[in-house]
Design a protein with these regions (language model features):
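Short, structured patches in soluble enzyme cores that scaffold and shape functional sites
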Residues: 98, 110-112, 123-127, 137-139
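Double-stranded beta-helix
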Residues: 130-190
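Non-heme Fe(II)/2-oxoglutarate
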Residues: 33, 46, 187-269
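Short edge-strand/loop segments of extracellular domains
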Residues: 102, 138-145, 204-209
Length: 269
């Protein structure tokens, strides 16, 4: 489904933009699902940031029957589940989709620390430019050799000694609703401005197989961490994580396969 060029851009630079991957109708439907569920979970869109919120915002695992598009994008849709395998060059295992209303900026960071890797599909639900919170990335920063150089760069920049920081060379990714950005989980990224910002994201990790128990455990822990927002105060029965998605897998071959992999890993009972 993806072109050779798109796959190679992702592997070389750590990201690729997929313009119009969602139709206008799908983009509108996804925004409506995200806005409705966040408002129901937290009372408003964009609660005030707390003292220990990290990248401030409201985060909600979104895999309920009330949000059918978000539910189907996890593993029913080849544009996400199959595309993740094409980008990574191996079978994958999904996390849950996450509805987010960002209420602050983020500094340079990666989405994952451990040496597992993976891909995130990021959908901003309003138009985003440099001045309104578009994703900023450092191309190639997912590669271990470049990452080591960036750590050296960061260690000697003025901010490390309490002075004004350097502006790191980067690319701003302008998007409109319907566009999806595929991001390697080790790519350095940040966002600035445009708050509150509505988005929907999902991560896919490489399927580790069953021979390496340590790697299986690492993937399991990452998947569980991705959906356990312990700092968030919402009704876990109304937004139960995996339950409704897994219960509806019968007859959907790709979802059944994803459920089987998650059970082998110990993510699902």
């Amino acid at each position: 489904m993806l072109t050779h060029h798109q796959i190679m851009q992702f592997r070389t630079f750590g990201y690729v933009v997929l313009p119009g991957m969602l139709s206008q109708g799908e983009a509108d439907a996804l925004r409506a699902e995200v806005a409705a569920e966040l408002s129901a979970a937290f009372g408003v869109l964009g609660t005030a940031p707390g003292p220990n919120d990290g990248i401030s915002g409201d985060y909600l695992p979104l895999a309920v029957n009330r949000a059918p598009l978000s539910l189907s994008l996890i593993a029913d849709d080849p544009r996400t589940f199959l595309a993740s395998a094409e980008l990574l060059g191996s079978p994958t295992v999904p996390s849950l989709g996450t509805a987010t209303c960002f209420t602050g900026d983020s500094s340079w960071h990666t989405r994952q620390g451990p040496d597992i890797g993976g891909v995130a599909f990021w959908a901003d639900l309003e138009q985003r430019t440099a001045g309104t919170g578009a994703i900023r990335v450092i191309p190639g920063s997912h590669l271990p050799e470049f990452e080591r150089l960036l750590w050296q760069y960061g260690a000697i920049e003025p901010a490390a000694s309490g002075f004004e920081e350097w502006d790191w060379p980067h690319v701003v990714i302008d998007t409109k609703p319907g566009d999806i950005v595929a991001l390697h989980l080790h790519l350095r990224m940040c966002t600035r401005g445009g708050t509150p910002r509505l988005s929907w994201t999902i991560e896919y990790l490489p399927w580790p197989g069953v021979a390496d128990r340590d790697r299986m455990a690492a993937v399991r822990d990452l998947l569980l961490d991705e959906v356990e927002y312990d700092h968030e105060d919402y009704d876990r029965e109304r937004w139960p994580g995996w339950r409704e998605w897994a219960d509806g897998a019968a007859g959907i071959t790709s979802r059944e396969l994803a459920v089987e992999r998650l059970r082998i890993l110990g993510v699902l009972p």
